[in-house]
Amino acid sequence: MQQGLKGSIAGVVAAATLLAGGILTVPHAMALEADGQYYSSKQPYVAPSEATTASYSQAPEGYETVYTESMARHGSRGLSSYKYDALLMKMAEAAEADNGFKSDAIKSEFMKNLKAITAANVENGYGMLTGQGADQHQGIGARAYERSKTLFDNAAKDGGKIAYQSSGEARATESGENFARGFNAASNNKLANSTVTPADPAGTGEAAAFDKTPNTLYFHKSENPDGTEKTGEAKQRADDYQNFVENDAIIAGAEQTIAENEDVKTASHDLLSQIFTDDFLAKLADGTYAWYNTVDGTKGGEANCAPGADPSKDADACGAAKKKIASEYDAAMDLYNLYIIAADM
C-alpha cells in the first residue's frame, strides 16, 4: 500500500512540467500502451479492438444465450466536487500574498490553469459525464447488442423486455442513458420501447426508463443520491460500512503510515518545490499554514462554491467544508488528483 501510493506521487513529480505547461492539454491516457501514461482511478476506459471482440468465446455447440446482463460504473467525468481545485486555489492565493511562488511565470501559469479547470467543470457540471464518458457508454451499449444480437432480435420478435437500473446518482443515470442510446442505435431501435416499467423512475425523459435501486447499487451510504434515507436492513448495512471505513483501526493505521512515510514526504516536497518556495512550504510543514474548503479557508467558515457556478443546479459546485490542506502530503495528493482528471475531461 505504501509502495503504491509512493509511486503515484513520484509519478506526478515527473509530470509536473506538463501541469505547469497546461493542465487541460494533457494527452488522453491509453491503457496498455507500452509508453502510455497511467492515471490510477481516473484511467480512461479504452474500448476493445475489433480483434479482441472477435476473439470472445461463442456459446458451445447446442447452446444459445437466453439472458445477458451488463453492470458498469459511470463513464469519464469531471471533478466530483469543488475541492481539489478549491483548496489549491486557497494555497495559491496564500503563496501569492507571501511571495511563495518560485517565479512570477510559474505563479501566472499555475493560477491560470487552476481557474481554467474550475471553469471547465462549472461548464460541464461537477461530477457529470464528459463527452468522452458519453462516448464510452454508447460504445458499450452498441457492443452489448452486437455480442448477443440473436438474443435481442428474438426478444424483439417475442415481446421480450430490457430492465434498466441506476443507483440514482446523476452521472450513473446519465451513463445508462448513453448505454441505451448506443444499444438502440446499433439495434435500429428494435427494443427502444420494450423496457420494464420502473417502480421508482430515476427521472424524466430518457431517465424515466431507469429504476432507482440505491439499496443495491448505492449500498455504501445511508443517504441516497436523491437525499432520501435508507431504512431497515439497507440502512444498517450502510451504517456498518461507513463505521468500518471511518473507524477501522487497520485502515486508520495504514493511512497514517502512508502519510508519515519519509519517502512519501520527500516525494511530496519534491513535487511542490517545483512550484512553491522552500520558505513557503516550511510554513505549511510546521503548521503555520492550513486551509479548509471554506470561503475564508478557516475551519467552520462559510460554504465555498466554484466561481460562476449555480449551486441550485449543481450542488457539487460547493465543496465539503471538512476537506483541508494541512501538510505537504495533503497538497501533493490534491495536486495529483487534480492532474489526473484531465485525462477524462
Language model regions located:
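Long, internal stretches of domain cores in catalytic or enzyme-like folds
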Residues: 32-345
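Secretory targeting and sorting signals
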Residues: 1-31
